[in-house]
């Protein structure tokens, strides 16, 4: 049985690519045609890729792999957090900070600082500080929560990165590849399929398309960890 149907993808607008002048020729194998100056993605091939991605992701989850969802564009941000939380993955959905993977020791120290500040806030320790000092600590807490809140459960580097919008998340791609962390990537027609291990050709700008793909990948992770009936 297919992981996702052609009608579901059509309804989500997953077949709409970018303007033909903005394409990457390496994506030609996944393009069906062009209409009104816009490339149309071959959803039959997308369905095949989704099946492969689902099976691969489920297998990785079954073997205990840890996942990091990355997508910082406005229309993907909420979905990234929602689906990552649903399957117990970590996530980055506001801004990719340089060194999040390649400078993990420093990043982990900042995550630990976030946890310390949250403990101080919940215990009332910040409220007991002088007003000015308390305000400084709360601003630091808010900033760390915004950018690192999705990483609090990540005690070490992820085994797999799930990516929305390869072009926007260039630094995340480079860091993952430098560390040989496999990438499961949504690929629009302006992307490079050679820069990921598990490609999913589809519209990475439409919220419904992002929701559909990440939702299925989250399902795969949950199935791998808990079984299909849990």
Curated annotation (Swiss-Prot):
Family matches, as Pfam families: Ribosomal_S2
CDD domains hit by this protein: RPS2
One Gene Ontology term from the biological process aspect of the record: translation
SUPFAM superfamilies cross-referenced by the UniProt entry: Ribosomal protein S2
Record has Transcription as a keyword: no
Gene Ontology MF terms: structural constituent of ribosome
Keyword check for DNA-binding: no
Keywords: Ribonucleoprotein, Ribosomal protein
Gene Ontology CC annotations of this record: cytosolic small ribosomal subunit
Family per record: Belongs to the universal ribosomal protein uS2 family.
Protein name according to UniProt: Small ribosomal subunit protein uS2
Lineage: Bacteria, Bacillati, Cyanobacteriota, Cyanophyceae, Synechococcales
């Amino acid at each position: 049985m297919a992981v996702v149907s052609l009608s579901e993808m059509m309804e989500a607008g997953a077949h709409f690519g970018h303007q033909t002048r903005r394409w990457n020729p390496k994506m030609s194998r996944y393009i069906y045609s062009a209409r009104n100056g816009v490339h149309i993605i071959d959803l039959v091939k997308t369905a095949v890729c989704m099946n492969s991605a689902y099976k691969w992701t489920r297998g990785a989850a079954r073997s205990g792999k840890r996942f990091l969802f990355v997508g910082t564009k406005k229309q993907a941000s909420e979905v990234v957090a929602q689906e990552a939380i649903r399957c117990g993955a970590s996530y980055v959905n506001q801004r990719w900070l340089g060194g999040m993977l390649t400078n993990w020791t420093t990043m982990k120290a900042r995550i630990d600082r976030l946890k310390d500040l949250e403990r101080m806030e919940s215990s009332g320790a910040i409220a007991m500080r002088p007003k000015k000092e308390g305000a400084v600590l709360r601003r630091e807490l808010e900033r760390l929560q915004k950018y690192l809140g999705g990483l609090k459960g990540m005690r070490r580097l992820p085994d797999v990165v799930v990516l929305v919008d390869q072009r926007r998340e260039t630094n995340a791609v480079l860091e993952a590849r430098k560390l040989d962390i496999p990438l499961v990537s949504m690929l629009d027609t302006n992307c490079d399929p050679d820069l990921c291990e598990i490609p999913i050709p589809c519209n990475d700008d439409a919220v419904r398309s992002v929701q559909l793909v990440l939702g299925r990948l989250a399902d795969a992770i949950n199935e791998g960890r808990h079984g299909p009936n849990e």
